[in-house]
């Protein structure tokens, strides 16, 4: 399916392309956020900036209930809801830029891995857990603090009360067991550690 068909199927309509200067500004800020938030991963801020500045970014009309930003792996692009204030784009870009960093394709452009998600088998494995790991990393990077929430009659603390709160809590428990470095290294670099 073509990119245009994929967008149409999802109800995403591109309304504008972000200027090079805006993309560069977002890329610079996200690179700084990731490098300073995860020093143990030894991100090179300048290399990360150069990589992230290559991402095509768009404003789009998106259906109600969709995320405010969406990463489309087929064309390695980010689509921001046109209703997001410009000053908030970087906040939403962090999550999608992590998806960009974790994308692994074969020489024909077929997606093989996306962080903890393995697409090399007949069935997709780890998609939900990868999304939660990316949201956990995003919350850490943005300096989110624990908040108490109640879902399904369960009260618990989570670093991400509005986005995947229960699964982010599970990711935090996994990070406690494996060590946060190992979990996030696998998430950022699509490793099987």
Positions of predicted regions on the chain:
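Non-Sec secretion/translocation targeting segments of pathogen effectors
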Residues: 1-5, 134
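Pan-zinc metallopeptidase signature
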Residues: 5-9, 14, 154-193
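Auxiliary, metal-adjacent structural segments of Zn-dependent hydrolase domains
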Residues: 10-87, 107
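Short, surface-exposed acidic
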Residues: 40-52, 147-154, 178-188
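Active-site recognition of the HExxH zinc-binding catalytic motif
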Residues: 91-107, 131, 135, 139
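Extended compositionally biased segments used for macromolecular assembly or nucleic-acid engagement
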Residues: 111-114
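Post-HExxH zinc-binding segment in Zn-dependent metallohydrolases
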Residues: 117-166, 174
